[in-house]
């Protein structure tokens, strides 16, 4: 495939896609590490009407509370370093959730947590290392005109998507857009 502009924002597949780009120096491609995050839910009336974020833990924000659009509640995610993409939620992981959640919700009863869902975050730093920021490489870094590679873009990337788009546009030398006009 030939293109004038390519933005590699493939998330978990960003490194693999970058490896397929002709002329890209493999040394510019960071290693990929995988961190599964599981969520558990509870049934019944949610005990909270607001988000709760405990003090962050290494590798993530800790088991926090989020509310979904249907009025339900989710606890998570945790951080489990894995070797391959795997979305299985092991029920025994609930044990560590109970202790984490009881730090801010001591009334949580045993047996109330139910597996919700899991996601896999693309990390660019390995277990035990300080958390890495997003890595966004343009032509200045890898010497290929019209290419931007984005690595380690995890869930905050959704919140920061407009700012990330500005960074990508700048790296590609595109004109700035103001108030919907160029």
Residue ranges and their predicted role:
Residues 57-60, 148-161:
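Glycine-rich phosphate/pyrophosphate-binding beta-alpha loops
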Residues 1-143:
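Active-site substrate-recognition segment that forms the wall
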Residues 161-179:
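Internal hydrophobic alpha-helix adjacent to the cofactor/substrate pocket in enzyme cavities
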